[in-house]
């Protein structure tokens, strides 16, 4: 997956860009250049059909610009424009954009029983909801302590080793196992952000903000997919889901954070 390995390049180049314009970040001209820097990889990935990764890139960029001191007026303005655009799309253009599996996956979260008839056929409806439905059953059947490592019905979940690894963990180790797994991941995210906050070099701060944002976004989206509160968009659970390029990218990110921590940190208090 080239887009996974490209995350490193994007985080590093965007961090250097922010570091070069940090005193002029809120000037419209410089902000426009930053948004162009962010938009190019997002559009390329979107054209390839990987909207899940495109969303992660957008969150990475937002976290890094926030860490660099982006004005709240731009943040609130962007949120408002996005909300209005989404509401307008749903209200007036749903008949034009409401085609294809990506759109059906969104509608499957809103109306999983197809009461509004969004699916053109029963076969498409069953194919769309099957993965999340089986994942939810596997996750819920684990109870508090799970069914054991080789017990339960998790084998019936498509891609249980990848996007739905959390359903496998919930089935095998239960609610307690999921809490342990997510607790370790969130501890890593917090440590990454704290390392960035302690960095005496703003470049290190921006790098840690991007890496922390990427981890947090992937965790949140993957958990949402497994709980059927977000559509399936192909976002893996960091360090647990299968995938060579994804795991390689994650370990490189950890190495960058450790480099910032080792060479250029200060005490937060005192």
Regions found by a protein language model. Give the residues of each.
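Short gly/pro-enriched beta-turn/loop segments at secondary-structure junctions
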Residues: 101, 130-134
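Short hydrophobic "helix-edge" motifs at membrane interfaces and signal-peptide entry regions
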Residues: 39-41, 136, 231-232
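Hydrophobic alpha-helical transmembrane segments of multi-pass inner membrane proteins, especially
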Residues: 2-124, 167-227, 252-256, 270
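A juxtamembrane structural motif centered on a specific transmembrane helix
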Residues: 218-270
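Long extracytoplasmic/lumenal interhelical loops at the membrane interface
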Residues: 133-176
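Glycine/serine-rich anion-binding loops at beta->alpha junctions
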Residues: 2-6, 47-49, 53, 143, ...
């Amino acid at each position: 997956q080239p887009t996974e390995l490209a995350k490193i390049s994007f985080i590093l180049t965007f961090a250097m860009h922010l570091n070069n314009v940090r005193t002029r970040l809120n000037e419209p001209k410089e902000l426009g250049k930053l948004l162009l820097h962010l938009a190019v990889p997002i559009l390329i990935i979107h054209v390839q059909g990987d909207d899940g990764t495109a969303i992660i890139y957008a969150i990475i960029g937002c976290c890094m610009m926030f860490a660099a001191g982006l004005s709240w007026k731009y943040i609130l303005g962007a949120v408002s424009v996005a909300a209005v655009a989404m509401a307008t799309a749903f209200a007036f253009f749903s008949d034009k954009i409401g085609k294809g599996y990506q759109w059906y996956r969104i509608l499957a979260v809103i109306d999983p029983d197809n009461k509004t008839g969004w699916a053109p056929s029963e076969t498409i409806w069953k194919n769309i909801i099957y993965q999340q439905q089986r994942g939810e059953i596997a996750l819920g059947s684990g109870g508090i302590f799970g069914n054991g490592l080789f017990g339960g019905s998790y084998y019936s979940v498509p891609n249980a080793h990848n996007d739905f690894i959390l359903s496998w963990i919930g089935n095998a180790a239960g609610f307690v196992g999921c809490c342990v797994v997510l607790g370790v991941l969130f501890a890593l995210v917090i440590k990454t952000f704290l390392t960035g906050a302690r960095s005496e070099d703003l470049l290190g701060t921006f790098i840690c903000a991007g890496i922390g944002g990427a981890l947090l976004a992937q965790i949140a989206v993957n958990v949402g997919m497994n709980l059927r509160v977000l559509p399936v968009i192909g976002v893996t659970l960091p360090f647990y889901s299968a995938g060579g390029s994804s795991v390689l990218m994650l370990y490189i990110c950890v190495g960058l954070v450790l480099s910032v921590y080792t060479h250029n940190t200060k005490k937060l208090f005192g």
